[in-house]
């Protein structure tokens, strides 16, 4: 038993020892000895007998021998054993399976990592991690230095920088990006019109020309530039550009500050319009309105003064009589035959006579005649008279001189035969009697006042009244008699049982105790009163009166509820005592006690129910009156609501449109304003103000209470509700500050400009401002023949059927004429050029001799040039045999008069420097890497195009294969001969190959000198540079071989 206990203790100790991890660096170990009883083996000696062969014949040659041998035996003994013991190293203590370091001082903000050594949390330091990092350090033991800039705070734990407002970056070294500001650069800048934003506070630094908190406003009129501090110098109504200060002059003014009127002959915006005035009229420099000279009128002073007027603006009236003609300039009269005098007012004949010798009497009615013509005797009638002898009045509908003027009177009015004045019929007024009398007036000239009452309408002719329903009488003051109703009281009432009939619609208002449309039904049993809404409260009764509710007591009963046998007011023996109950209470016939009516209490029913109760015996509690100044009514229990509330419990707000006590008053709020249900005060919808919200916001303001100022420009109106700008025609944008985009104009920029030929379009009206040489509403027409220039207002001066350029006015002369105005006869040689403007210095004979001489010299020069060219080609061929160049073609050919098709990067390696195209072309094509599917040769190109404009290659060429051929190449190597494909093809200017020449055996390109050379257009001299010169590609060389 002792042995077993000892073994268990040892086993437990061993287990405890083995619990620590020996691999743990904090676990130390040492060897310890212990004694163990063991069974040990040893060598035990013994005498071993064995036999050997010998010569002892007796023992059959076998002899016995002895030797000491050993065998393994076992015995008990004590053995000293050693074992490794694990324990925590010094400075550590054991905790479970681990060895934990031990710190004498507790690590406040950290952990103990080795004996008496703390590892602090980030942001803390000191031996026991109890000290926080200063503002310049962070991390464990505050060992890291903060990198934050610009006043940023450093996180003592992570070292992250908490940037001040306006900065960003991991070290807060950068300002906020444009367009942001504030803490963390999270706030967007509100600045507009290109203004910069302070990265810290977001304050806007406005660009020149803008102002306001957010730079949303242009400089006020009269200022411009940075901070709107510069004063505008513009005069005469000129507006100043809010940024530059440049003056935009109003029409009629020009100059840097708009101080100068338009020069004579011009007017309008920028003085760009020519005055259209004729006959010496002067043009207003602002409007262009013509101020005509005496005798002329009209927009352009093209019209003479009309008959009967003269002078400036034709404002003076001629005073010529008897048909005399008035000079439109001076007003002098030119008399008809038979009259004389400054105003032709004197007859040559005496009054009453006419004819030759003034012997014939006038046939006219003297009273109605102005005069008798002294020659013909024709009568000139007074206004309002007509006929040959002026004895007939004007026919109906005409008046005035000769009864020629039609009357304009309306609605049956009379027209005065002389003046045409209208005499209006009753009920109408106005100059031509076109206006009916205003409400409340009638009669001639609407001078009488209507006397209709109670909404009756008055006839504008005679003032008779048309009464509304329910009224009658001449002035609608009499209501319909009892039993009638309706228009003119023509309807009869059908109400029964004394019910009243509405004089307007005939509806019946029943008396108490009756029901039905015509009040023909009595109240149902158990009900009484108005609309039968009350319930009978009787005990010993046969119902109650349907009108008053009085109980009809059965025989032997009396009292209000028929619950008393004594007569009302009596009780006691023989009902001898008078009841003293008040407020309708009844007394008991036995003891005279009062039974109070509903709503009353007390011995004599002299008091009303206490607050909060009502009804019989004041036993019913009042309902919860939500919005009431006092409890319910002591009799009915109905809640008496405060102003603004309704319903049985006063818990309902007045319906929309009503307010006040019992919601009986009608709200007066207009324009969607909301009405307070208590006092009827109006809370206005945005855009309206006033006691009843009937006043719109004044111009320039909007929103609730018209608090906000409008920001619209260029005459735009501002919505009083939300401040939205309604732009005037020609403007767009949120604040109507942007003109319509090009090609658009008008309202909302929704109309498309129709201007043609480069004309500019007014962004407001869409009116086209034509360029020089064009006219028409949309500038679609050239100037008419004979005119040119701006507005087609200049007249051409070309002569002899020549044509005039509609823009410049240049004359294009007909054959046989010359000169600036084509007014000079041209000589024969000049007829070849109809546009010449220089007269020859020689006569016709000298021209002929000179022409012949020139032609001969030209032919001689051509022969010499051809000879030199042939000699040059021969020398080139001879040199070519010696040099034997390798020619590499990358053609982009265009050969006229052919049908071949070539394109692509075509190369050839030939030792010959010449070949005949028409004969060897097929062989060349066979040996070439070109195919018809990769090369194109267009025969439709212009055969006279210059080599300076190479065609666009349709082949895909290597980068080094294109050489622009602008001039012949002068080099040591000869030209490559490229003859025509056919004898008919003499012009090969269109052949544009890119030719590269690489000298055999040379490692560099041949140098060349480039001369400026442009092939002439529209002309060609056969044999002159018919062959393209060979030109080495400037990009070709050894390096190019490496690339390929």
Curated annotation (Swiss-Prot):
Gene Ontology, cellular component aspect: basolateral plasma membrane
Annotated segments matching region Disordered: 1023-1044
Membrane topology annotation: Single-pass type I membrane protein
Residues annotated as signal peptide: 1-19
Compartments, record wording: Cell membrane; Basolateral cell membrane
Coiled coil, from the record: none
InterPro entries for this protein: EGF-like_CS (IPR013032), EGF-like_dom (IPR000742), EGF_PEAR1L-like (IPR057138), EMI_domain (IPR011489), LE_dom (IPR002049), MEGF_diff_regulators (IPR052485)
S-S pairs: 28-89, 54-63, 88-99, 103-118, 120-129, 146-154, 148-161, 163-172, 185-197, 191-204, 206-215, 228-240, 234-247, 249-258, 271-283, 277-290, 292-301, 314-326, 320-333, 335-344, 403-415, 409-422, 424-433, 446-458, 452-465, 467-476, 493-501, 495-508, 510-519, 575-587, 581-594, 596-605, 663-675, 669-682, 684-693, 710-718, 712-725, 727-736, 753-761, 755-768, 770-779, 792-804, 798-811, 813-822
Residue ranges of every copy of the EMI domain listed in the record: 24-101
PANTHER family linked: DELTA-RELATED (PTHR24052), MULTIPLE EGF LIKE DOMAINS 11 (PTHR24052:SF13)
Entry protein name: Multiple epidermal growth factor-like domains protein 11
């Amino acid at each position: 038993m002792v042995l077993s206990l000892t073994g268990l203790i040892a086993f437990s100790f061993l287990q405890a020892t083995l619990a620590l991890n020996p691999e743990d660096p904090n676990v130390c170990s040492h060897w310890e000895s212990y004694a163990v009883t063991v069974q040990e083996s040893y060598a035990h000696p013994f005498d071993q007998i064995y036999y050997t062969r010998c010569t002892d014949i007796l023992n059959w040659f076998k002899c016995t021998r002895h030797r000491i041998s050993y065998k393994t035996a076992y015995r008990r003994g004590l053995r000293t054993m050693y074992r490794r013991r694990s324990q925590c190293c010094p400075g550590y203590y054991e905790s479970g399976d681990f060895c934990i370091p031990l710190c004498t001082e507790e690590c406040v903000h950290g952990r103990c990592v080795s004996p008496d050594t703390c590892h602090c949390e980030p942001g803390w330091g000191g031996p026991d991690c109890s000290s926080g990092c200063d503002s310049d350090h962070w991390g464990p033991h505050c060992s890291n230095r903060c990198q934050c800039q610009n006043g940023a705070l450093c996180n003592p734990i992570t070292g992250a920088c908490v940037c001040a407002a306006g900065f960003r970056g991991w070290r807060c070294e950068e300002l906020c990006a444009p367009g942001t500001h504030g803490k963390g650069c999270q706030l967007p800048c509100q600045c507009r019109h290109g203004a910069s934003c302070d990265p810290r506070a977001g304050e806007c630094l406005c660009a020149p020309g803008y102002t306001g908190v957010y730079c949303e406003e242009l400089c006020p009129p009269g200022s411009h530039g940075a901070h709107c501090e510069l004063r505008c110098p513009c005069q005469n109504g000129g507006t100043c550009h809010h940024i530059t200060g440049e003056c935009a002059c109003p029409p009629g003014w020009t100059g840097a500050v708009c101080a100068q009127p338009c020069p004579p002959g011009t007017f309008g915006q920028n003085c760009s319009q020519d005055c259209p005035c004729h006959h010496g009229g002067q043009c207003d420099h602002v409007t262009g309105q013509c101020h005509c000279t005496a005798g002329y009128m009209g927009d352009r002073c093209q019209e003479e003064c009309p008959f009967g007027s003269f002078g400036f603006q034709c404002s003076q009236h001629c005073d010529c009589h008897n048909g005399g003609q008035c000079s439109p300039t001076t007003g002098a009269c030119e008399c008809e035959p038979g009259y004389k005098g400054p105003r032709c007012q004197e007859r040559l004949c005496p009054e009453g006579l006419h004819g030759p010798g003034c012997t014939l009497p006038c046939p006219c009615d003297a009273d109605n005649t102005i005069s008798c013509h002294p020659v013909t005797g024709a009568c000139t009638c007074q206004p309002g008279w007509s006929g040959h002898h002026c004895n007939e009045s004007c026919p109906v509908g005409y008046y005035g001189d000769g009864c020629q003027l039609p009357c304009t009177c309306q609605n049956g009015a009379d027209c005065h035969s002389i003046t045409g004045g209208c005499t209006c019929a009753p009920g109408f007024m106005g100059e031509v009697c076109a206006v009916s009398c205003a409400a409340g007036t009638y009669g001639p000239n609407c001078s009488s006042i209507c006397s209709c009452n109670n909404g009756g309408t008055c006839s504008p002719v005679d003032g008779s009244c048309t009464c509304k329903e329910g009224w009658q009488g001449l002035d609608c003051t009499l209501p319909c008699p009892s039993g009638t109703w309706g228009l003119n009281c023509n309807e009869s009432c059908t109400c029964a049982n004394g019910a009243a009939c509405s004089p307007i619609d005939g509806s019946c208002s029943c008396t108490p105790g009756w029901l039905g449309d015509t009040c023909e039904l009595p109240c149902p049993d158990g009900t009484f009163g108005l609309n039968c809404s009350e319930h009978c409260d009787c005990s010993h009764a046969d119902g109650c009166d349907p009108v008053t509710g009085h109980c009809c007591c059965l025989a032997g009963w009396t009292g209000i509820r028929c619950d008393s046998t004594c007569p009302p007011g009596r009780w006691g023996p023989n009902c001898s005592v008078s009841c003293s109950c008040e407020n309708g209470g009844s007394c008991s016939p036995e003891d005279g006690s009062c039974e109070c009516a509903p709503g009353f209490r007390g011995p004599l029913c002299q008091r009303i129910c206490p607050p909060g109760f009502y009804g019989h015996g004041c036993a019913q509690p009042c309902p919860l009156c939500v919005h009431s100044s006092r409890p319910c009514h002591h009799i009915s229990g109905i809640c008496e609501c405060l102003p603004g509330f309704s319903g049985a419990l006063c818990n309902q707000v007045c319906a929309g449109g009503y307010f006040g006590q019992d919601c009986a008053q009608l709200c007066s709020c207009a324009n969607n304003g909301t009405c307070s249900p208590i006092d009827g005060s109006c809370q206005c919808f945005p855009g309206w103000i006033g006691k009843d919200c009937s006043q719109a916001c004044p111009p320039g303001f909007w929103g609730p209470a018209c608090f906000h100022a409008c920001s619209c420009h260029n005459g735009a109106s501002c919505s009083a509700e939300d401040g939205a700008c309604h732009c005037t025609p020609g403007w767009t944008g949120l604040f109507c500050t942007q003109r319509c985009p090009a090609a658009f104009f008008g309202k909302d920029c929704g109309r498309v400009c129709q201007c043609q030929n480069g004309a500019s379009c007014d962004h407001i009206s869409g009116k086209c401002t034509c360029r020089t040489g064009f006219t028409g509403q949309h500038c679609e027409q050239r100037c008419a023949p004979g005119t040119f220039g701006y507005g087609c207002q200049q007249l051409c001066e070309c002569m002899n059927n020549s044509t005039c350029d509609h823009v410049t006015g240049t004359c294009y002369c007909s054959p046989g004429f010359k000169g600036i105005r084509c007014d000079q006869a041209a000589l024969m040689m000049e007829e070849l050029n109809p546009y010449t403007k220089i007269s020859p210095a020689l006569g016709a004979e000298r021209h002929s001799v000179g022409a012949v001489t020139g032609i001969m010299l030209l032919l001689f020069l051509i022969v010499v040039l051809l000879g030199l060219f042939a000699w040059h080609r021969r020398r080139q061929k001879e040199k070519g045999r010696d040099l034997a160049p390798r020619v590499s073609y990358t053609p982009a050919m265009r050969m006229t008069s052919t049908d071949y098709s070539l394109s692509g990067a075509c190369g050839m390696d030939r030792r010959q420097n010449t070949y005949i195209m028409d004969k060897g072309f097929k062989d060349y094509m066979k040996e070439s890497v070109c195919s018809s599917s990769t090369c194109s040769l267009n025969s439709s190109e212009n055969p006279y195009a210059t080599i300076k404009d190479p065609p666009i290659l349709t082949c895909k060429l290597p980068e080094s294969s294109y050489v622009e051929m602008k001039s012949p190449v002068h080099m040591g190597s000869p030209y490559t001969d490229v003859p025509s494909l056919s004898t008919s093809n003499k012009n090969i200017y269109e052949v544009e190959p890119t030719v590269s020449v690489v000298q055999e055996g040379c490692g560099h390109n041949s140098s060349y000198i480039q001369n400026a050379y442009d092939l002439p257009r529209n002309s060609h001299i056969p044999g002159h540079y018919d062959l393209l010169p060979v030109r080495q590609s400037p990009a070709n060389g050894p390096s190019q071989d490496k690339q390929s």
